[in-house]
């Protein structure tokens, strides 16, 4: 299906020159003079090569038909990440470059949305928030409760983030998967 370039967003799949590309980033640029353009960074699905394209915002781009389904994360091995369709129990192997940096937030039995073109996984969407445990952080300093500054912490998945001063080692916190930022203390 053809769409205008300015409507392309991160995660969309574009068909160009007979090959499929996943959009890594898309930005509409409106210079003071001249025609507005869409700067689109894409990753070729077949071999992972990244390219950058610039289109006029009114140019037509071929958007590939993608099917999104819920899958359950099972495990990781040297070949990639393995997911299961909870309805049919079919298993799908997703290459490591498709999962990318989101791999740190994958947890066993987590439900994720896999975008598939034919039978090929092209992108993955994790839940917006995950609950993790703080394994390393500085101790609470008395009198620091009034400041709004965050202190560094290492989470159970190895990711570093900033947490409020009252968070201690062993505390379970909710983290945003998009950027790894602290959201709140877990309520469990």
Curated annotation (Swiss-Prot):
Family: Belongs to the elongation factor P family.
Subcellular location: Cytoplasm
GO BP field: peptide biosynthetic process
Domain of life: Bacteria
PANTHER family assigned: ELONGATION FACTOR P, TRANSLATION ELONGATION FACTOR KOW-LIKE DOMAIN-CONTAINING PROTEIN
Swiss-Prot/TrEMBL keywords: Cytoplasm, Elongation factor, Protein biosynthesis
Pathway note: Protein biosynthesis; polypeptide chain elongation
UniProt-recorded name of the protein: Elongation factor P
CDD domains the record matches: S1_EF-P_repeat_1, S1_EF-P_repeat_2
Keyword Protein biosynthesis: yes
Broad class of where this protein is predominantly found: cytoplasm
PROSITE patterns with a match to the protein in the record: EFP (PS01275)
GO molecular function, one term: translation elongation factor activity
GO terms for cellular component: cytoplasm
Function: Involved in peptide bond synthesis. Stimulates efficient translation and peptide-bond synthesis on native or reconstituted 70S ribosomes in vitro. Probably functions indirectly by altering the affinity of the ribosome for aminoacyl-tRNA, thus increasing their reactivity as acceptors for peptidyl transferase.
HAMAP family registered for this protein in UniProt: EF_P (MF_00141)
């Amino acid at each position: 299906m053809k769409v205008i370039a300015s409507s392309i967003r991160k995660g969309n799949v574009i068909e160009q020159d007979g090959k499929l590309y996943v959009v890594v980033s898309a930005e509409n640029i409106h210079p003071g003079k001249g025609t507005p353009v869409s700067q689109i960074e894409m990753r070729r699905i077949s071999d992972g090569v990244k390219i950058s394209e610039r289109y006029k915002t009114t140019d037509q781009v071929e958007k590939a038909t993608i099917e999104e389904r819920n899958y359950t994360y099972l495990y990781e091995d040297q070949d990639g990440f393995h997911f299961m369709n909870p309805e049919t129990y079919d298993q799908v192997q997703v290459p490591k470059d498709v999962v990318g940096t989101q791999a740190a937030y994958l947890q066993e039995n987590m439900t994720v949305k896999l975008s598939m073109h034919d039978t090929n996984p092209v992108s993955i969407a994790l839940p917006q928030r995950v609950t993790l445990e703080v394994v390393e952080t500085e101790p609470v300093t008395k009198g620091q409760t009034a400041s709004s500054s965050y202190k560094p912490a290492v989470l159970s998945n190895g990711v570093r983030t900033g947490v409020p001063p009252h968070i201690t080692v062993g505390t379970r916190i909710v983290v945003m998967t998009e950027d790894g930022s602290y959201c709140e203390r877990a309520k469990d």
